[in-house]
Amino acid sequence: MNKKIQNILTEIESVIVGKNENVEKILMAILAQGHVLMEDVPGVGKTTTALTFAKVLGLDTRRVQFTSDTVPSDVIGYSVYDKSADSFVYKPGAIMTNLLLADEINRTSSKTQSALLEAMEEHRVTVDGQTYDLPTPFVVLATQNPTGSAGTTLLPSSQLDRFLIRLSMGYPDHKSQINILRDHHSENPLDRVQPVVTKDELLELVQETRNVEANDRIFDYVTTLAEATRTHPMVELGVSPRGALALCRMAKAHAFLSGRDFVVPEDIAAVFPDVCAHRLILSAKARMMEEKAENILAEILKSVDMPVLKA
């Protein structure tokens, strides 16, 4: 594993206890220039995770706590008239940062959700006819409460598709919970976190991730998996071409963290559930049976032959 990557993980895991796998997946998503949706109950460390990543990676960060009265201009900014200059001046919103923590994104209106998610896809915002590019890198770590919680608005599938991966933090195990209590007993662990890389060094790691090689056998495997989701009897809407591209990007990051400059089929299989579960729309029968997308994807992985790469 790259030494810088190892140092990043070590520093983050000193705060985010017992969640090493999720920490690695979030770092992969950042290296793949993707956005992360963390879905879980309150109090399991979603916000702390986002703040820790921002600090360790040397990124500017801002936070939006979404509520029912959050409006699009809070996120993307607005124009105000400057009398002295006799012109309108752009006042940036929270989105003009490197890492945006979008807290409880499903508690706000569809209009505000759309403003954020369009900017996530296009990496720019348009206000009063003027277009403004977002900073580089730009990553959104969004949190949402489980569907059905009071005051939540379901994200449409087209908007869920903008997130590279969806994760659930889950409750810590017994030992990790004790460590969390011990760490927070006398101080906030975030106070002792130090930046491990600069913004420019992070961008170099992003470029190295992009340079990871993948061949036609890998592309064929990804395509076959995506097609299998579209024809599965329990799936109404499967993985889109954008989802297949996301799978390749995340697999490159998985290979990079594994110390390789090329993708193997195991990279695809490892990230398949996290990249694709939130992109599936299950059939009425599947929903009635309370079937889970993750179980369907596991079944598809078993049914599709993994290619053997030639040396």
Question: What would you call each of these model-derived segments?
Answer:
Residues N2-V44:
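Pre-Walker A (pre-P-loop) alpha-helix and adjacent loop at the N terminus of AAA/AAA+ ATPase modules
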Residues E24-M28, Y81-L101, Q130:
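Conserved alpha-helical scaffold flanking the Walker A/P-loop in AAA+ ATPase domains
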Residues I30-T67:
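Walker A/P-loop
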Residues D40, D103-E104, A115:
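Walker B catalytic acidic pair
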Residues V41, V75, T143:
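P-loop (Walker A) phosphate-binding loop of NTP-binding proteins
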Residues V56-S84:
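AAA+/P-loop NTPase substrate/partner-engagement loops
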Residues D82-A85, T108, T112, M120-V212, ...:
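Canonical AAA+ ATPase core
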Residues T231-A311:
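C-terminal engagement/docking regions of AAA+ P-loop ATPases
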